[in-house]
């Protein structure tokens, strides 16, 4: 057998290809000659130092495909190529699918919400857009038109009202005939005038109350009852038999603490 030191001679580089021994060497024994004859072609594997040091790599051979698999691949290739070719060529297939799904979703949403289309009790009332108009107070249809009094009639009515606020039937008939008015017109005018006078009187009383309110502090009350002898003496003066002089209360005493016990007397 050949020694392992001769491996470099047996293998050739990638460019030379596989090396084959030419013939039987002049070996001493017949066994070595027969072994060398039976040697087969050795594949070129870069196991030498020079091959390992260099960056050259052997070309990778494509694996052999069995004939059965090759025939099956040839049959399947025409079936797969049209689909892949269309997909690689930017086919509108993936673009059409979102529209189809969107249309299906919209149809499903319409089918899933029938209460929106059906005018049932859950449907919102339709809104009628109308121009914004100022809504005025509607008067009664059978309301009589307002009487346009003249200046002389108004002056005569005011003078009569100051003399007498309530007129009898005879006085009202005579007064209405003198002013060329009906009794109903005079009657209604006096009613409205009395209501106006009442409102004015209430407003005057309210003004007087507001004017007199700051004079006394809030929550202030007299430290003694109204029906006490001291209060009666101050009211009636010397005519009261048990008259006692009333001492004047200083202004500071109004806000002092001893007066506070009568705060809730009149409340």
Curated annotation (Swiss-Prot):
Keywords noted in UniProt: Developmental protein, DNA-binding, Homeobox, Nucleus, Osteogenesis, Repressor, Transcription, Transcription regulation
Tissue: Expressed in mesenchymal tissue in the developing spinal cord and limbs.
Region of interest: Disordered: 1-42, 104-132
SMART domains (alphabetical): HOX
Superkingdom field: Eukaryota
Inducers of expression: Up-regulated by BMP2.
PROSITE patterns, alphabetized: HOMEOBOX_1 (PS00027), HOMEOBOX_2 (PS50071)
Keyword Methyltransferase: no
Location within or outside the cell: Nucleus
Keyword Transcription: yes
CDD domains according to UniProt: homeodomain
InterPro entries xrefs: HD, HD_metazoa, Homeobox_CS, Homeodomain-like_sf, Msh_Homeobox_Regulators
Membership in a protein family: Belongs to the Msh homeobox family.
Coiled-coil region: none
DNA-binding region: 142-201
Species in which this protein is naturally found: Mus musculus
A Pfam match: Homeodomain
Assembly description: Interacts with MINT. Interacts with XRCC6 (Ku70) and XRCC5 (Ku80).
GO biological process: activation of meiosis; anterior/posterior pattern specification; BMP signaling pathway; bone morphogenesis; bone trabecula formation; branching involved in mammary gland duct morphogenesis; cartilage development; cell surface receptor signaling pathway involved in heart development
Function noted in UniProt: Acts as a transcriptional regulator in bone development. Represses the ALPL promoter activity and antagonizes the stimulatory effect of DLX5 on ALPL expression during osteoblast differentiation. Probable morphogenetic role. May play a role in limb-pattern formation. In osteoblasts, suppresses transcription driven by the osteocalcin FGF response element (OCFRE). Binds to the homeodomain-response element of the ALPL promoter.
A single GO cellular-component term on record: nuclear speck
GO molecular function, one term: transcription cis-regulatory region binding
Protein name: Homeobox protein MSX-2
């Amino acid at each position: 057998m050949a020694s392992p030191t001769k491996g470099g001679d047996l293998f050739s580089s990638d460019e030379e290809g596989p090396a084959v021994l030419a013939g039987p060497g002049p070996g001493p024994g017949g066994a070595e000659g027969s072994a060398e004859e039976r040697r087969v072609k050795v594949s070129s594997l870069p196991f030498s130092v020079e091959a390992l040091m260099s960056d050259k790599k052997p070309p990778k051979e494509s694996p052999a495909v069995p004939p059965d698999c090759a025939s099956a691949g040839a049959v399947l290739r025409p079936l797969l190529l049209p689909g892949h070719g269309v997909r690689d060529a930017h086919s509108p297939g993936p673009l059409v699918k979102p529209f189809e799904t969107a249309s299906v979703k919209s149809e499903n949403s319409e089918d899933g919400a029938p209460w929106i289309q059906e005018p049932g009790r859950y449907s919102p009332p339709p809104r009628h857009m109308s121009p914004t108009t100022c809504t005025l107070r509607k008067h009664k249809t059978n309301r009589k038109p307002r009487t346009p009094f003249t200046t002389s009639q108004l002056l005569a009515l005011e003078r009569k009202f100051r003399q007498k606020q309530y007129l009898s039937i005879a006085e009202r008939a005579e007064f209405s005939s003198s002013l060329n008015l009906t009794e109903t017109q005079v009657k209604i005018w006096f009613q409205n005038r009395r209501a106006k006078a009442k409102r004015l009187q209430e407003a005057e009383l309210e003004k007087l109350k507001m004017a007199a309110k700051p004079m006394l502090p809030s929550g202030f009350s007299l430290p003694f009852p109204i029906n006490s002898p001291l209060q009666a003496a101050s009211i009636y003066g010397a005519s009261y038999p048990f008259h006692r002089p009333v001492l004047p209360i200083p202004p500071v005493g109004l806000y002092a603490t001893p007066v506070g016990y009568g705060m809730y007397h009149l409340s």
